[in-house]
Amino acid sequence: TNYTIGDVNYVRECFATNPDDVLVLRMSASKKKAINAKLSLSMLRESEISTDGNQLIFEGTVNFPKQGPGGVSFQGRIAISAPNGTLQAEDSSISVNDADMLTIVIDVRTNYKNDAYKSLCKETVVKAEKKTYEKLKKTHLNDYTPLFDRVSLQLGTGEYAGLPTDKRWEQVKKGGYDPGLDVLLFQYGRYLLLASSRENSPLPAALQGFFNDNLACNMGWTNDYHLDINTQ
């Protein structure tokens, strides 16, 4: 994502890397000291939020009271680095000041078939942090590109191809014709599936990709794993 505020150009990149098993976000600015941010969490479920050095940690147990006892415990770690800026950790947030580049590494684990999920979460983040952003990205591209490039789709471009994505959406809602946007969404869906469901994933992606807890996504079904007409 590219955008400009005033005379500063910002670039944001995000990818889920299977080889390193983390989410990686990078934000850069064309001007020094242009990135100032406070990273905190607003959780939908009860959880404890703390900091450990440059890491923001959240952990708890997911319960579904209406469905009886059960649920998995989880821990997530968000590691933050800003080489040309400063970090300030508080009880439940980390501030980034006067940076021109910000990198965030995220891993989340549950105790589903893994009692050592907390130590694995920490080890995974620490290991990824030791690699440069360029190395993480290159490894990711080498892994997923051969899979992604198996399919291509050409439907034409249309007159709105040069607009930002949100502006293209606006034109389509007004009745505009933009087949290139259909291609973009098709390939985006493929990328999400490749990022969330691989041969070494603990569980495959569900029908809509995520479990519905009636908080993050309020639908009339739970989107869980069960046998019904979909198996046909």
Question: Each PLM stretch: what is its role?
Answer:
Residues 2-232:
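Aromatic-residue-lined binding/catalytic grooves and analogous aromatic/hydrophobic interfacial grooves
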